[in-house]
């Protein structure tokens, strides 16, 4: 998907259809002002309840000298550790009680040329306090020496996580792109020495020098009145005095490098080959610039589409294939690549280059272009629903990006007209000319090494690939796409009952036992959102099929449906802008589909074929086997993989569904086994539910349900046992000394194998317990003990499993392993015995705020509905989510905490130590 919003068509008048330097039109709903001290503010009122705030100081690591590396980032951290009106971490606690979550709603980031503070408010009740804190950030941060020393551990934890020793290919590619530039010399996080040597005085000096009103901007969107909030801004910020006036120049003119390279990959990655093409600088202020951005996006998508079809037609295994148009700092790039097993290197290099050369010399077909442009047309058609779903944080983030990149924040009407014009102008001739313009130049190729590869061995390979690219391309034998390929039901089924249900549902009981929950909703726009799912998943199949289960989804997708091959299916789905996402879980299975409402017949026909007409190609099965073997082998050779395998095999007996499948186990998998899995999952009814949300009427939906859903033949299914089988003697402690990092991965697993079955309210209780647990972990391990930047806690059990299985995860300095053990022991013990009403109230508020997205987001809502329906959790709990959350009592949470962390639980500690 393009990371921008596209708007539906307006009829153009008889004006010229040629993009030019006409300026883009600003969104007039923005009010921009400037205080006498130089601080700018940007206000965007909406009808939403929420309010989003962004406070940006256009200062970052570029302002640091050699002795100040990482100071801008360190100052950002200190804003959450005490200021004029907020002591310690009080600001985090305050906004959490209002429904915000640290990280998602309360956060900040530091870049090369800006530092931005973010607050998301549930309503206007805490707006004054939010602005008070942001005013504190401007010149009221307190640099308590003890807090500075504590925060060093947190920042070093962030440094360990974000600057790994075992660097991924993408990490190395980024640093290669800034090699020798000013970016390389100013890493925002700094270095370990600078972080450790920072003092309260040195940080305060940097802060007082650079945090100045003339460098700062405040963005407020959502539930505010322009005049009222402008007056409050003036009241809060007008007295912020300028104390320094150093020159700050926004640098958007520093190009990144696109050069032939050979780069290392991480231990879990496979070899790869890539290209990267410079497309100039960011900055979108004219129609022509916007059209060029779209042209680049189309070119990238055409490249990816062709690469995928070539690889799939050849039944070549691959780890990934991509082509994207994106921004790297202030440079626009088009990049693409493919990853593969070491044994395929020669063939994949050849296919990659030949495909690009063919595109350069012969372009694409009309069918290929139509497949890509369908996404633009769909976004255009869905203007109103997409625009209505935009929340205050969308407007705030978009404005922040536009200010940073010097873009015009475009009006809806202008965007709509310009996109309409682009679609009209982007003919096959134009698209191929643009594609040729991208590829008809010296293309820098980049090679990603595999494990054991030596840099010197492959040093000249990128140049050899470039030489091969200069040869004439080969014209494809056929570029035709198949317009029909889905098989039709021989006989329609029946609707045997229709019931109305709270929430605006029509509930259809079909003759084959499927239950369809249809919710008409204008917010869905011109899209139809569908989930078709059932209990079962891996728990439903014979243990002998577990290896085949790992391959089933990708094999089916690559093979195709009905009379479509995999490549033909991909083209057909793109052309019809239909998303089809099969899901095979541990205890459930199904498919998610999103398509145009006027093409609901096509979408449901696709569902019918997925349920009845998969067509496994033996070549694709072999390709997927090789893909799995390469991926799983690389993973299990890594330190993390070895730790996970050790923990898994020490917990679960052989031939149980949670036992990890290794690479050598998939070799014997047959087509018959894939077919058997499909028949078990989609040929038997374990309570299939279909949830459909669309702006349609029951009269439009019912005939299609009879034709395509009620016609799916289903057999009765035997009852399933979802019990989780564990080994008798679980080890309390496991360690692997194969880590690639200088840090220790610290995992604590808390397991209770005997827990009662759950209902809908239990899911709310569990979610709230996780929020409480995470808040405790962040307070104890991050803020108090300074052991890790981002410790985590999360449940791992699946729906229907009557167990409790939680993990505490952190990445720490090896010397702190014993201290972390003590801290985790304390956290777990206190969770089991002492939870407060305040914590329950805060978690309930946060959960209610997060679930509010169901009101405006049909896809988000559909996922929740489906989960609750197939698991019999009771959909009423969701329909009244705020009431359900508020009804959770302290005693209920304490009881769940005791079951989860208290007496009777088993504990396992797993450590990955450096080699």
Language model segments and positions:
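Gram-negative bacterial Sec-dependent N-terminal signal peptides
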Residues: 1-17
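Proteolytic maturation boundary segments
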Residues: 15-40, 225-266, 271-280, 284-285, ...
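M16 family metallopeptidases and their MPP-like homologs
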Residues: 44, 49-61, 71-72, 89-137, ...
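Active-site recognition of the HExxH zinc-binding catalytic motif
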Residues: 69-77, 81, 301, 546-554, ...
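Long, His/Glu/Asp-enriched segments that create or flank divalent metal/ion-associated functional microenvironments
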Residues: 296, 779
């Amino acid at each position: 998907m393009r990371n921008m919003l596209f708007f539906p068509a307006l009829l153009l008048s008889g004006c010229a259809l040629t993009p030019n330097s006409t300026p883009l039109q600003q969104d007039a709903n923005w009010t921009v002002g400037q205080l006498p001290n130089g601080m700018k503010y940007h206000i965007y009122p909406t009808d939403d309840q929420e309010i989003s705030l962004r406070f940006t100081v256009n200062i970052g690591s570029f302002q640091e000298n050699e002795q100040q590396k990482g100071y801008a980032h360190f100052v950002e951290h200190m804003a959450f550790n005490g200021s004029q009106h907020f002591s310690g971490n009080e600001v985090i606690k305050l906004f959490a009680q209002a429904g915000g979550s640290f990280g998602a709603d309360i956060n900040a980031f530091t870049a090369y040329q800006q530092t931005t503070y973010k607050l998301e408010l549930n309503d206007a009740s805490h707006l004054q306090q939010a602005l008070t804190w942001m005013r504190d950030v401007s010149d009221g941060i307190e640099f308590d020496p003890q807090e500075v020393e504590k925060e060093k551990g947190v920042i070093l934890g962030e440094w360990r996580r974000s600057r790994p020793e075992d660097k991924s290919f993408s990490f190395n590619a980024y640093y290669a792109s800034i090699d020798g530039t000013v970016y390389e010399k100013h890493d925002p996080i700094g270095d370990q020495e600078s972080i450790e040597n920072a003092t309260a005085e040195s940080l305060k000096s940097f802060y007082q020098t650079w945090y100045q009103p003339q460098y700062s901007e405040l963005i407020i969107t959502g539930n505010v009145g322009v005049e009222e909030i402008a007056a409050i801004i003036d009241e809060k910020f007008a007295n912020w005095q300028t104390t320094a006036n150093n020159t700050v120049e926004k640098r958007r003119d520093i190009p990144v490098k696109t050069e032939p390279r050979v780069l290392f990959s991480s231990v879990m990655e496979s070899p790869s080959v890539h290209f990267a093409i410079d497309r100039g600088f960011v900055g979108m202020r004219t129609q022509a610039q916007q059209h060029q951005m779209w042209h680049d996006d189309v070119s990238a998508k055409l490249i990816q589409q062709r690469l995928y079809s070539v690889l799939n037609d050849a039944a070549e295994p691959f780890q990934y294939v991509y082509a994207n148009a994106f921004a790297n700092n202030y440079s626009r790039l088009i990049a693409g690549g493919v990853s593969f097993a070491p044994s395929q290197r020669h063939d994949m290099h050849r296919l990659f280059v030949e495909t690009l050369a063919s595109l350069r010399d012969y372009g694409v077909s009309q069918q290929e272009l139509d497949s890509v442009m369908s996404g633009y047309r769909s976004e255009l058609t869905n203007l109103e629903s997409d625009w209505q779903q935009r929340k205050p944080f969308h407007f705030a983030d978009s404005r922040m990006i536009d200010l940073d990149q010097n873009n015009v924040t475009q009006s809806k009407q202008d965007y709509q007209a310009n996109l309409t014009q682009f679609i009209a102008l982007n003919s096959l001739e134009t698209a191929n000319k643009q594609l040729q313009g991208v590829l008809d130049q010296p293309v820098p190729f980049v090679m990603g090494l595999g494990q054991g590869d030596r840099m010197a061995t492959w040093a000249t390979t990128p140049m050899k690939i470039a030489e091969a690219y200069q040869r004439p391309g080969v014209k494809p034998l056929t570029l035709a796409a198949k317009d029909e390929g889905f098989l039709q039901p021989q006989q329609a089924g029946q609707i045997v009952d229709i019931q109305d249900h709270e929430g605006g549902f029509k509930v259809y009981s079909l003759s084959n036992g499927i239950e369809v929950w249809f919710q008409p909703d204008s917010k869905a726009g011109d899209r139809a959102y569908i989930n078709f799912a059932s209990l079962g998943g891996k728990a439903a199949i014979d243990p002998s099929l577990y290896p085949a289960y790992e391959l089933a989804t990708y094999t089916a997708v690559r093979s195709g449906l009905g009379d479509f091959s995999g490549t033909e299916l991909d083209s057909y789905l793109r052309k019809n802008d239909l998303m089809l996402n099969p899901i095979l879980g541990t205890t459930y299975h199904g498919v998610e589909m999103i398509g145009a409402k006027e093409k609901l017949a096509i979408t449901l026909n696709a569902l019918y074929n997925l349920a009845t007409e998969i067509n496994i190609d033996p070549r694709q099965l072999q390709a997927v086997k090789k893909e799995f073997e390469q991926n799983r082998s690389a993973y299990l050779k890594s330190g993390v993989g070895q730790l996970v395998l050790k923990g898994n095999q020490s917990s679960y007996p052989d031939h149980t569904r949670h036992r990890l499948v290794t690479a050598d186990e998939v070799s014997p998998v047959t087509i018959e086994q894939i077919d058997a899995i499909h028949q078990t999952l989609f040929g038997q009814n374990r309570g299939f539910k279909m949830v459909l949300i669309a702006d349609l009427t029951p009269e439009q939906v019912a005939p299609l349900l009879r034709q395509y859903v009620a016609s799916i033949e289903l057999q009765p299914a035997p009852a399933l046992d979802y019990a989780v089988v564990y080994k008798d003697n679980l080890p309390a402690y496991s360690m692997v000394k194969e880590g690639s990092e200088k840090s220790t991965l610290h995992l604590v697993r808390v397991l209770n194998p005997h827990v009662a079955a759950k209902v809908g309210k239990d899911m709310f209780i569990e979610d709230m317990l996780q929020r409480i647990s995470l808040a405790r972990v962040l307070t104890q391990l991050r803020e108090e003990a300074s052991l890790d930047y981002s410790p985590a806690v999360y449940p791992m059990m699946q729906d229907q499993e009557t167990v409790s299985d939680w993990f505490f995860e952190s990445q720490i300095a090896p010397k702190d392993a014993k201290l972390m053990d003590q801290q985790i022991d304390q956290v777990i013990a206190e969770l089991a015995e002492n939870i407060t009403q305040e914590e329950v109230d805060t978690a309930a508020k946060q959960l209610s705020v997060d679930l509010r997205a169901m009101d405006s987001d049909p896809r988000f809502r559909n996922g929740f509905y489906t989960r609750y329906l197939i698991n019999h959790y009771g959909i009423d709990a969701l329909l009244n989510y705020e009431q359900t959350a508020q009804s959770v009592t302290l005693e209920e949470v304490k009881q769940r905490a005791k079951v989860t962390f208290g007496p009777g639980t088993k504990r396992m500690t797993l450590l990955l130590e450096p080699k």
